[in-house]
Amino acid sequence: MAKASETERSGPGTQPADAQTATSATVRPLSTQAVFRPDFGDEDNFPHPTLGPDTEPQDRMATTSRVRPPVRRLGGGLVEIPRAPDIDPLEALMTNPVVPESKRFCWNCGRPVGRSDSETKGASEGWCPYCGSPYSFLPQLNPGDIVAGQYEVKGCIAHGGLGWIYLALDRNVNGRPVVLKGLVHSGDAEAQAMAMAERQFLAEVVHPSIVQIFNFVEHTDRHGDPVGYIVMEYVGGQSLKRSKGQKLPVAEAIAYLLEILPALSYLHSIGLVYNDLKPENIMLTEEQLKLIDLGAVSRINSFGYLYGTPGFQAPEIVRTGPTVATDIYTVGRTLAALTLDLPTRNGRYVDGLPEDDPVLKTYDSYGRLLRRAIDPDPRQRFTTAEEMSAQLTGVLREVVAQDTGVPRPGLSTIFSPSRSTFGVDLLVAHTDVYLDGQVHAEKLTANEIVTALSVPLVDPTDVAASVLQATVLSQPVQTLDSLRAARHGALDADGVDFSESVELPLMEVRALLDLGDVAKATRKLDDLAERVGWRWRLVWYRAVAELLTGDYDSATKHFTEVLDTFPGELAPKLALAATAELAGNTDEHKFYQTVWSTNDGVISAAFGLARARSAEGDRVGAVRTLDEVPPTSRHFTTARLTSAVTLLSGRSTSEVTEEQIRDAARRVEALPPTEPRVLQIRALVLGGALDWLKDNKASTNHILGFPFTSHGLRLGVEASLRSLARVAPTQRHRYTLVDMANKVRPTSTF
């Protein structure tokens, strides 16, 4: 409805869905299309014009200026969007409404009509030489025409797949601008009558993000035939369609679709499917985004004329009819068209994704979301618009965090927060040998990971959900006791039959895994899967069991399956990162990075990322990651100590610089002396400095209160060891520390 570029005019439009791939050399234009299925009930699905937003200014209506902030925030406040200008409706009028010959096709058979040849100029109206149907590409309404005694036509604003679209003023409502669109092609009188009767349900569609239907009217054309028109709200602004080669930033595109998904959800809730989502059918106004062009809306599972746009329309629609899954497909294709360089063939977008597109390589979760949304198997797509919206929000948080460097944490609707941390003490723990004389492991264990990972939240629709909520935070043994009581009816006050519950046996599996009884948990999981199939929660616990048994390849496969299902979730990413680290796979870097950059409350990811970077030789990057742990975290001190150890440990003296030694010392010095591990890290830093000084020279400026000389550092190491000896847990270790202090002390001179 707003003014559009030449490129927009040449883009895909609404057409009947092809029942089979055309083999003819002639290609129909990419407008919204339909396929007719005469063997099914033919309700609610009739041709309609698409809003092709090509306009040129003519004259101007009076407008009232308003002061608005120059930007607004979408996507839950995560994305800043410039406000669209408020456009005068009359600026949308076309001064010369002509359909180019290249876009003239028969409305009935789809063959080219009205084309010029070497001898004659193409006629704007006539009869199709192939099927004999009448066609006309001339406007049926002219400026000044009064439709239904109420709507004064001002002119054409676009041409859709089934005719011209007009701007009119409602003389009964203070000259309010409206849009008139033909219901079906004017050459089909019977379809006109049916459309007027069948499309009345659209008037009941009321949603703030959907264009409002005001009326259905008829007007006699110049041949004396009645033509039905739908009268709709005029939506000023601009469509999301961009010129060829122009793409939106991923965050912006996601924010737009998050505004539209509630409208689709509303339609689905009242048994309708939109059918024709694409960038040109989403209008960005000064105040909001709106779906326009309801001509393709139909009832779920209805057949007849099924409208959509090739390249956006789900391939199975000719078999299944319109479904929620076919609408989900169009959301994925719309996102892809807005952000990716999609290849075209015969004037339409090719199915699938260009896997080498840099956007997909940059935003892994975004690519996973698109692949699920457009999965060729409709059963594998998001099941509802709400589910897709939740995952899209999670992906948006990742994208914005990656783009800005600022974490954007959010609560999951299907996973609990991490139950604890893992790997936080790994690097500093080996310095505990100073404290107790015991050698401490520096590797992750599967048990440590499993007890820390998030767990799937209880499905609120499960028959046992109300009982299970009380056991979520219980210890494993208590959980098993509660579940046994539930099975015997002790917790069932309402007489509910728990035999059909999926969550109750799943809670048992979780408790058994936490207790380390993997064999019994696996048997229960297999029994449950035999009854209900491998649902995603079962797949999650299967991966956990495989992680505990050391089957890292299978665990990775099944955690990945969960991630592909819910690409906006951080829980499977953290699980994959930890599994990869146990397996010695360098991929942990990628997933630890994603989790940490998105949510700086997942401390395990920070320490995991630091370990990964340190293993790659990137000590600077590892320390930088540890420095990102916020001071409000209870692991802040451990992060500072770990950064000091990272700077010095596991390296030869030739790899260490004086500045790195002093940096480690500053980190220790900044910590409170009451921190239990400060003494041992002081000893480590001073001892490392002493070893380094044997082969290098340094300034004599003090470090941790001692001169940076051999004599000064020996005094420092001695003092640290004697302090540790005073708090040693055993007499034997105390003597060991005192012996070490005596050996390192500088030689006394008299």
Curated annotation (Swiss-Prot):
Protein name: Serine/threonine-protein kinase PknG
Effect on the protein upon substituting residue 109 to S: Lack of activity
Protein residues bound to ATP: 157-165, 181
PANTHER family xrefs: SERINE/THREONINE PROTEIN KINASE, SERINE_THREONINE KINASE LIKE DOMAIN CONTAINING 1
Subcellular location: Cytoplasm; Cell membrane
Domain notes: Contains an N-terminal rubredoxin domain, a central kinase domain and a C-terminal TPR domain.
Catalytic reaction(s) noted: L-seryl-[protein] + ATP = O-phospho-L-seryl-[protein] + ADP + H(+); L-threonyl-[protein] + ATP = O-phospho-L-threonyl-[protein] + ADP + H(+)
Consequence the record notes for mutating residue 87 to S: Decreases inhibition by AX20017
Function as written in the Swiss-Prot or TrEMBL entry: Phosphorylates GarA. May play a role in metabolic regulation via control of the phosphorylation status of GarA. Plays a crucial role in the survival of mycobacteria within host macrophages, by blocking the intracellular degradation of mycobacteria in lysosomes. Required for intrinsic antibiotic resistance.
Residues modified to Phosphothreonine: 63
Keywords: Antibiotic resistance, ATP-binding, Cell membrane, Cytoplasm, Kinase, Membrane, Nucleotide-binding, Phosphoprotein, Serine/threonine-protein kinase, TPR repeat, Transferase, Virulence
Family as reported in the entry's similarity comment: Belongs to the protein kinase superfamily. Ser/Thr protein kinase family.
Effect on the protein of changing residue 106 to A: Decrease in activity
Pfam family, one: PknG_TPR
Enzyme nomenclature, EC number: 2.7.11.1
Top-level enzyme category: transferase
GO cellular component, one term: cytosol
Any single GO BP term: symbiont-mediated suppression of host innate immune response
TPR repeat feature ranges: 536-569
Region described as Disordered: 1-66
Residue span(s) of domain Protein kinase: 151-396
Quaternary context: Homodimer. Interacts with the FHA domain of GarA.
Residues of the active site: 276
Description of post-translational modifications: Autophosphorylated. In vitro, incorporates up to four phosphate groups on Thr-23, Thr-32 and Thr-63 and/or Thr-64 and/or Ser-65. In vivo, is probably phosphorylated only on Thr-63.
